[in-house]
Amino acid sequence: MFDQLFQESLIYLPDFQVNAAPSSLICELVESLCLIDGAMLRWPFHLARMQASCQALGWQDISEDLSKHWATASTQMPEDCRQGRTMARIVYGAEGIRSITFRSYSPRLVRSLRLVEANHVDYALKSTNRKVIMECFDQRNGCDDVLMVRDNLLTDTSIANIALWHEQHRRWYTPARPLLRGTHRAFL
């Protein structure tokens, strides 16, 4: 199963190419996957982003390590995570997979957004260090979340890319320069 998924992920690899970041500043990345009743959503897109991130940092290919760790972790998934919506969190670094954890997940309800300038934010790689994102989030002033603006362009919220539906054109629009190239954004 994984061999086919890894091959499919190569199709999406260009969607997640990033300029190389100084590898000394980034030592740990994370990938968060949604599972519905145990089935992974958009798995090839997540794999492509992980592979592109490793390439950008000059890290080893994690495909084999991920396959091995996932096989073990999925058998140890808590019973309450086998049904409904579950978040799988994969933490990895230059040497490979560090951990895979699971938790039940309910999307956060967002009814209000505050625009926050984020010209200083560089989050092209999904790092476990979200300090700069949380600094923006802390400026929400009573709103549920923030909508970050970089160079006068809408980018992302603190937890997701944005997608805007154009009723007349009957299609989704996403920012051309998001802070992080999201998997659902690439899927759209």
What are these regions (language model features)?
Residues 165-167, 172-187:
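Short, hydrophobic/π-rich interface segment
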Residues 142-173:
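Conserved active-site beta-strand-loop modules that form the wall/rim of enzyme catalytic pockets
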Residues 1-153, 179-187:
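Conserved alpha/beta cores of soluble small-molecule-handling proteins
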